[in-house]
Amino acid sequence: MELNNKEDSPRHTVPFVRQITEDGKAKLEIYRPTTNPIYIYTQILAAIAVSMGSMVVGFASAYTSPALVSMQNTTITSFKVTEQEASWVGGIMPLAGLAGGIAGGPFIEYLGRKNTILATAVPFIVAWLLIAFANSIWMVLAGRALSGFCVGIASLSLPVYLGETVQPEVRGTLGLLPTAFGNIGILICFVAGKYVNWSGLAFIGSILPIPFMVLTLLIPETPRWFVTRGREERARKALQWLRGKKADVEPELKGIVKSHCEAERHASQNAIFDLMKRSNLKPLLIALGLMFFQQLSGINAVIFYTVSIFKDAGSTIDENLCTIIVGVVNFGATFFATVLIDRLGRKILLYISEVAMVITLLTLGTFFYYKNSGNDVSNIGWLPLASFVIYVIGFSSGVGPIPWLMLGEILPGKIRGSAASVATGFNWTCTFIVTKTFADIVAAIGNHGAFWFFGVICLIGLFFVIFFVPETQGKSLEEIERKMMGRVRRMSSVANMKPLSFNM
């Protein structure tokens, strides 16, 4: 008679297994890979708390689009803003985000995931007040730089926190909440920007971090971080809070401890050497690839310069109304993805996303080419908005949120902080390059050429997803790590495991 090990059972099955009790009788029980998957209320609270920070990030990302119009109006602004300075108002935030992303890695390792997230709240408030009270362009740039630094830290720490606290059954859904709330922030900025100038918009931005700070104070640190610090009892309490008072958290805690001990045995004393190990390099390169194709889709150029793009297109629809429509669609598409991601999986949504973006970017490029050739486009003035709507739906349902979700899933626990720091820094480097050079690209190859360029990048991104990106739907972090590092046992016999028979 061969007894099967519970740890060998595949993640997607819930097999019935007979165990022999102390009195010699067989006991039938269900092996569940996680504890109490029904109780998720506290996990929802934790997800909402950190996602409020993402709303601040979204507001900061969208600020340039409505603010620059009034900032460059000399009847509103007491100081002059040149075109070059205006480009830095948009470009300095991703550059500072790069610095924040690099600094965020050590922060989440030594301060903890929660404390790092919480530490961004007050600097966010200070940054927005600097902009609101600015009497020179330098104060605006200082505020944008400080907010960008916080955005970089938040971009790194939010997905790591959620990846380490939420159960696999709902990790996809709750893991997309930061993106959904980020899109709420974008929408708030677009709507408010229609009615207030750049200074009033900054005052609104200074209010948003307050509820984020209050809610974050209520949630625990991640159990996995406590385990890495040798605080097993604190990890147990955090798990109990997250899974419910009546949940048996011991199996999950033992799995976390075992995974950490295994990672420690394979780790070197040098973090850089750990990153460069072949087993760790694979998930890191996949994360970098996802970030590259996310930003080279041109999304930040679209968000930062939405009003200007519609003005250049000669759209018959009010420019500010266009940005609000795009914001509403962005928000709605993310919630659509939130509903589907744990049903369809990550890769299917990425396929749909990339295809939609390829088609719409090529369409936009063709529209601008037709217009720039001197043709009358007044009868298709609706086309830029229609293309933008489909483009945003495509981005927000896959390429936008999923790379951040997978950042907290595929990176091994031992290097999660440093690897996430590298990936986030790389993301913001790409963001800065695209944002700062978008105007130069348009000047060099025309706006039609710019959209065609981004469309080709999205097409390449589709093939990257097909051949290199793994499916993580429904898998625990420990199982994903074993698979990515090539330490998964062959489980064909376990997958077909039958109840053991006993002669009684």
UniProtKB/Swiss-Prot annotation:
pH dependence: Wide extracellular pH range, between 4.0 and 9.0.
GO cellular component: plasma membrane
Keyword DNA-binding: no
Tissue expression remark: Highest expression in the fat body. Not expressed in other tissues including the midgut, muscle, and integuments after 24 hours of dehydration.
Keyword entries, A-Z: Cell membrane, Glycoprotein, Membrane, Stress response, Sugar transport, Transmembrane, Transmembrane helix, Transport
Domain of life: Eukaryota
Single GO term (MF): trehalose transmembrane transporter activity
Entry-listed glycosylation sites: N73, N197
Extracellular side: 61-87, 142-145, 193-199, 305-320, 369-387, 446-448
Transmembrane segments: 40-60, 88-108, 121-141, 146-166, 172-192, 200-220, 284-304, 321-341, 348-368, 388-408, 425-445, 449-469
Cytoplasmic topological domain residue ranges: 1-39, 109-120, 167-171, 221-283, 342-347, 409-424, 470-504
Membrane disposition: Multi-pass membrane protein
Localization (cell): Cell membrane
CDD domains (UniProt xref): MFS_GLUT6_8_Class3_like (cd17358)
Record keyword tRNA-binding present: no
Induction of synthesis: By hypersalinity.
Gene3D superfamilies named among the record's database cross-references: MFS general substrate transporter like domains
Protein's GO biological process: trehalose transport
Family: Belongs to the major facilitator superfamily. Sugar transporter (TC 2.A.1.1) family. Trehalose transporter subfamily.
Function text: High-capacity facilitative transporter for trehalose, required to induce anhydrobiosis. Anhydrobiotic larvae can survive almost complete dehydration. Does not transport maltose, sucrose or lactose. Mediates the bidirectional transfer of trehalose. Responsible for the transport of trehalose synthesized in the fat body and the incorporation of trehalose into other tissues that require a carbon source, thereby regulating trehalose levels in the hemolymph.
NCBIfam families: SP
This protein's name: Facilitated trehalose transporter Tret1
Source lineage: Eukaryota, Metazoa, Ecdysozoa, Arthropoda, Hexapoda
Gene expressing this chain: Tret1
